[in-house]
């Protein structure tokens, strides 16, 4: 079966609808931009907002209480600590966390000392770290860092997902690697996709094992330079066609 779903960036709403309609499978191959690396696992993730409180005042006064400056100081230290605590080396697929400071806002203009500032942060981490465990670490680091700096910072969770790693003995993983070798004449590279995909929901909420494999470099996705090489698309098509034929027993 082939399924085309929407709203993957909106927490997998299309995949959730697919499951509500009763879709079941022994394996799902998701075509995300993995640079044609066969990804046997999917990162966990957390998305949250940090809000700093200060004290408003006239922009020409020497008063303290600038919430924007407070949050800037806080965030610089906080991110370094998150990078250290969520780094996983003792794995067949090691991964350091990916942290994106995607939004930072505060204040009204130069004549007013801002009393509030907030930022929104997305963290992807090794699948061995659950969303709950990651959240506990972030909560602790927010508390410790704020107390150390004498800052007032509030954490608001926006979204989270658990990752996974497929067993290397999975028969469909073996067949896909075999199909790759037969079509390209090379041994496939395997790894983790270091982003949330529909696989997170399908694996944990639908009980469907997932492999993520597709053309394109994720660095260009969601950017003004988004593109995919035609050569890579054709290679992926040939590999998946052979894989489907192997699974179905077809000779075509």
Can you say where each PLM-predicted feature lies in the sequence?
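Acidic/histidine-rich catalytic neighborhood of metal-dependent amide-processing enzymes
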Residues: 1-47, 51, 252
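Metal-dependent amide/peptide-bond hydrolase catalytic core
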Residues: 40, 47-252
């Amino acid at each position: 079966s082939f399924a085309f779903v929407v709203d993957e960036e909106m927490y997998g709403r299309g995949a959730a609808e697919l499951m509500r309609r009763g879709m079941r499978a022994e394996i799902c191959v998701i075509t995300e931009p993995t640079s044609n690396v066969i990804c046997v696992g999917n990162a966990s993730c957390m998305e949250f907002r940090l809000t700093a409180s200060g004290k408003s005042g006239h922009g020409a006064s020497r008063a303290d209480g600038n919430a924007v400056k407070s949050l800037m100081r806080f965030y610089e230290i906080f991110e370094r600590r998150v990078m250290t605590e969520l780094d996983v080396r003792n794995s067949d697929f090691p991964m350091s966390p990916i942290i994106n400071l995607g939004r930072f806002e505060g204040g009204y203009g130069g004549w007013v000392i801002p009393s509030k500032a907030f930022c929104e942060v997305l963290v992807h981490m090794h699948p061995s770290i659950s969303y709950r465990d990651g959240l506990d670490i972030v909560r602790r680091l927010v508390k410790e860092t704020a107390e150390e700096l004498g800052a007032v910072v509030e954490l608001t969770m926006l979204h989270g997902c658990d990752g996974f790693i497929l067993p290397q003995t999975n028969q469909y993983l073996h067949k896909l690697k075999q199909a790759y070798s037969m079509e390209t004449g090379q041994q496939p590279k395997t790894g983790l996709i270091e982003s949330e995909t529909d696989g997170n929901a399908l694996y944990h909420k639908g009980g469907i094992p997932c492999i993520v494999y597709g053309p394109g470099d994720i660095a260009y996705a969601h950017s003004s330079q988004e593109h995919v090489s035609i050569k890579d698309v054709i290679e992926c098509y040939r590999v998946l066609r052979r894989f489907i034929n192997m699974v179905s027993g077809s000779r075509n």
